[in-house]
C-alpha cells in the first residue's frame, strides 16, 4: 500500500519538462523568503503599532501595486518576452524589500508597499507564459500544479522560518526575503535559456502558401481578439476575483484572528498556517494526476469554491475548539486551493492566441491582484465594524457568488 502510494506520487511528476522544473526551483527559492507578506498584518499592528484600519489601507496599497504590476507585466511580456521580465522584477523586488525595512511613516509605507506589489505581480504573467512555452497540452495542468507545489512548499518554509525569525527582530524578515529574490534571479539567469515566443519584438514568421505567395501566419489566427473584449473570459475573471477575495483572507485576516481571538503567538500562527502549504505540496500533484481528465475544469473549480465556504464557516464555532477548527480550516481551504487554482490557471492559458498570451495571463493575474486590494480592505473594515464572525459569513456569501459565476460559465461552454 505504501509502495503503491509512493509510485503514484512519483508518476504524477513524470513527463514534466526540465525547464518547468527549473522554473519551479526559481519560484521555490523566491517564495521561501515571502515572510514579509505572510506576516505583514502582524508587523504593521504589532511592530509599528498601526490600528487594524490603518493596516488595512497599507495592505490595500500592496494590492493596488499588484494590479498595476500585473497589467504592466502582461504588456512587457508580450513586448520583451517572459525571460527578461522575470529576472528584472525579481531584482527590483529584492531592492524594494530592503528599502521598506526602514520605513515607518504611514504614507511612505503606502508608497513602498505599492512598489513592492508592482514588481511582485509583474513577475506572474511572465512566469505563467514561461510555463506554457515550456510545456505541452498533456503536461500543462501538471506543470502548473508543480509550480504551485513549489510555491506552497516555499510558503510553508516562509511561515515557519518567519515565525522563528521574528524572535531575532522584524528586520530579518526583510533581509532574508530580499536575499531570496536576488538568489532566484541569479538562478534564472544562469540556468534557463529563453525559448523564442511570438511577441512585438519577435513577430510570427511569414509562411509560404500556394502559387508562391507569402502570408503573415498571425493573420490566419482565428482568435486574436483582445482579452478585454472576450466576454466569456471576463466572466471567468470576475468569478476568479470573487473567489480569490475569499481565499485571500487566509493571508490578510486569519493571522489576526488567530492572534486576537485564539491568543496565539507568531511562532504558533506560522506553524498552523504552514499546514496549508504542506497539504498542497503533498496532495496536489498526485490528486491532479488522477482526476485531471475525469471531469471538465469548471467542475473542479466549483468544488474548490465550496471548500472555501465550508472552511471559513468553521470559524463561527466556539473558540474553545480553536485547535480543531484551525486544523480543519487549513485542510479544507487547502483542498479548495487544490481544486480551484491549477484548473483555473490551466483553463486560462488555453484562451486567446499565442500573441495575446501575456494579455490574457495579465488579466488573470489582475483578478488576484485586485483581490489583494479588496480582501484586506473588506476584511479589516468588516472586522472593525461587526467582528470576525460577520467576516466569515460574508466570505461564505461571496463563495456562493463565485460558485454561480463559474456554473454559468460551464453552461456557456456546453452550448
Walk through the language-model features, giving the residues of each.
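Helix-loop boundary and gating motifs at the non-cytosolic
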Residues: 13-63, 234-239, 244-272
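Helix-to-loop junctions at the C-terminal end of transmembrane segments
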Residues: 70-81, 166, 283-296
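Helix-breaking motifs and short loop linkers at transmembrane-helix boundaries and internal kinks
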Residues: 49, 81, 102-107, 317-320
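Symmetry-related core transmembrane helices of the 12-TM Major Facilitator Superfamily/SLC fold
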Residues: 174-190, 392-407
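Residue-level signature of mid-helix packing/kink "hotspots" within the transmembrane helices
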Residues: 35, 63-67, 71, 155-156, ...
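Cytoplasmic helix-loop-helix junction between adjacent transmembrane helices
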Residues: 114-151
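Juxtamembrane intracellular "pre-TM" segments in multi-pass secondary transporters
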Residues: 2-17, 195-237
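Structural signature of the two symmetry-related core transmembrane helices
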Residues: 84-98, 299-313
Amino acid at each position: 500500500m505504501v509502495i503503491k502510494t509512493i509510485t503514484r506520487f512519483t508518476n504524477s511528476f513524470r513527463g514534466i519538462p526540465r525547464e518547468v522544473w527549473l522554473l519551479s526551483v526559481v519560484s521555490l527559492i523566491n517564495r521561501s523568503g515571502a515572510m514579509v507578506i505572510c506576516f505583514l498584518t502582524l508587523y504593521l499592528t504589532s511592530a509599528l503599532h498601526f490600528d487594524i484600519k490603518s493596516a488595512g489601507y497599507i495592505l490595500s496599497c500592496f494590492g493596488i501595486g499588484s494590479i498595476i504590476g500585473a497589467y504592466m507585466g502582461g504588456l512587457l511580456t508580450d513586448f520583451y518576452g517572459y525571460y527578461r521580465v522575470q529576472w528584472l522584477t525579481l531584482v527590483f523586488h529584492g531592492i524594494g524589500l530592503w528599502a521598506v525595512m526602514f520605513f515607518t511613516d504611514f504614507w511612505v509605507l503606502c508608497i513602498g508597499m505599492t512598489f513592492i506589489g508592482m514588481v511582485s505581480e509583474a513577475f506572474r504573467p511572465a512566469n505563467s507564459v514561461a510555463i506554457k512555452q515550456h510545456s505541452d497540452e498533456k503536461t500543462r495542468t501538471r506543470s502548473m500544479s508543480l509550480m504551485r507545489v513549489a510555491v506552497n512548499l516555499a510558503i510553508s518554509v516562509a511561515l515557519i522560518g518567519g515565525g522563528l525569525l521574528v524572535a531575532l527582530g522584524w528586520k530579518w524578515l526583510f533581509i532574508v526575503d530580499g536575499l531570496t529574490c536576488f538568489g532566484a534571479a541569479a538562478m534564472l539567469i544562469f540556468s534557463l535559456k529563453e525559448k523564442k515566443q511570438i511577441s512585438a519584438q519577435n513577430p510570427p514568421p511569414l509562411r509560404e502558401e500556394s502559387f508562391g505567395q507569402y502570408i503573415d501566419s498571425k493573420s490566419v489566427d482565428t482568435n486574436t481578439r483582445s482579452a478585454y473584449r472576450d466576454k466569456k473570459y471576463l466572466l471567468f475573471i470576475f468569478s476568479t476575483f470573487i473567489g480569490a477575495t475569499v481565499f485571500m483572507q487566509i493571508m490578510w485576516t486569519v493571522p489576526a484572528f488567530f492572534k486576537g481571538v485564539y491568543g496565539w503567538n507568531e511562532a504558533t500562527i506560522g506553524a498552523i498556517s504552514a499546514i496549508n502549504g504542506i497539504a498542497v505540496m503533498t496532495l496536489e500533484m498526485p490528486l491532479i494526476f488522477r482526476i485531471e481528465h475525469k471531469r471538465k475544469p469548471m467542475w473542479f473549480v466549483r468544488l474548490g469554491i465550496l471548500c472555501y465556504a465550508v472552511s471559513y464557516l468553521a470559524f463561527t464555532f466556539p473558540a474553545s475548539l480553536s485547535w480543531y477548527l484551525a486544523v480543519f480550516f487549513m485542510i479544507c481551504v487547502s483542498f479548495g486551493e487544490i481544486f480551484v487554482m491549477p484548473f483555473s490557471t490551466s483553463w486560462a492559458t488555453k484562451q486567446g492566441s499565442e500573441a495575446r498570451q501575456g494579455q490574457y495571463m495579465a488579466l488573470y493575474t489582475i483578478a488576484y491582484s485586485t483581490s489583494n486590494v479588496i480582501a484586506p480592505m473588506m476584511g479589516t473594515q468588516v472586522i472593525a465594524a461587526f467582528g470576525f464572525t460577520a467576516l466569515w459569513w460574508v466570505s461564505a456569501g461571496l463563495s456562493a457568488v463565485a460558485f454561480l459565476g463559474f456554473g454559468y460559465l460551464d453552461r456557456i461552454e456546453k452550448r
